């Protein structure tokens, strides 16, 4: 007769959770940031707001974004004028879009990750799906299970409306699932479509306008598992530890509220200051067990909430400019895609490391950190260990 302890030991994996594959996807509609203010004020019938348009132009110029991808085309917006208004009842129209499109975009990213992984999709044991938009029952996790043809017994976890920190959250959850379930292979998908937050400009709500200048659409998928099968699975990064914390004195710094008018977005000016002031403590707690205190000796993946956050973190910690290269590259090429961003950066980093002939997936370095920042103000901190190329 076996005891519970023996059963538990048999259920656990031997090694750390490992990222085994990464896939990304975007809508086909690409938006040039330099011409976006003209387009945005025209499509929202706001061209008479000339001073506000100049303000928005400056926001776009300072955003450090070159282009973004958006499911909302001019044609879709013309068919749904209420989405273009500042505060018109439009939730039904928005929901009709995202409930369908979020799982579809997630499917494209997942198929790429599964292809790189090289194993049969029938070996996926768990699915973690994360999106800020489109709450529905059954959820996007169910829709994706059907779209991909996953096993009906796949264990699903659906995360709605977490916001920009959630790319770190899904890694934390996937780590626990993989390490506590021997042989588990977790498909993690973050799919974000901004149709819930798009709205016309208003002088009274400038933080909403900041969102209109930053947010883009994208989906990223990863496969996570412990004890990679030699010769078959190729590890990319190991997930060493993961923590979540609420920053002090940050209540109301980033808020989102689902209303008849869609998801309204509220942002206090001091968000970059709050993050940069507290990031050192998060790093100390994460890396003290490893005896690491030189933040230039590790590789960096930080959610690019906006350029001001990156600039202030860089300055506060004395980071060399190249530390946030991968992060800034993704911000420039895609904008802020909420939870999907850090997974895009993970993908960019391993690809650039291989392209540049570096010795590890983490820009030639052994240890790294991944940060998610979002509503709360919540910070997710994931310690990563790179793999030799």
Curated annotation (Swiss-Prot):
Named from the GO MF annotations, one term is:
naringenin-chalcone synthase activity
- What pathway is this protein said to act in by its record? Secondary metabolite biosynthesis; flavonoid biosynthesis
Biological-process GO terms, alphabetical:
flavonoid biosynthetic process; polyketide biosynthetic process
Reactions catalysed: (E)-4-coumaroyl-CoA + 3 malonyl-CoA + 3 H(+) = 2',4,4',6'-tetrahydroxychalcone + 3 CO2 + 4 CoA
This enzyme's EC code(s): 2.3.1.74
Q: Which residues form the active site?
A: 164
Cross-referenced InterPro entries: Chalcone/stilbene_synt_C, Chalcone/stilbene_synt_N, Chalcone/stilbene_synthase_AS, Polyketide_synthase_type-III, Thiolase-like
Q: Is Transferase set as a keyword in this record? A: yes
* Keywords linked to the UniProt accession: Acyltransferase, Flavonoid biosynthesis, Transferase
**Protein's UniProt keywords contain NADP:** no
Tell me where the signal peptide lies.
Answer: none
Q: Where are the transmembrane segments?
A: none
Family, as annotated? Belongs to the thiolase-like superfamily. Chalcone/stilbene synthases family.
Q: What does this protein do?
A: The primary product of this enzyme is 4,2',4',6'-tetrahydroxychalcone (also termed naringenin-chalcone or chalcone) which can under specific conditions spontaneously isomerize into naringenin.
Q: What is this protein called?
A: Chalcone synthase
- Organism of origin is Catharanthus roseus (Madagascar periwinkle)
Gene that this polypeptide is encoded by: CHS
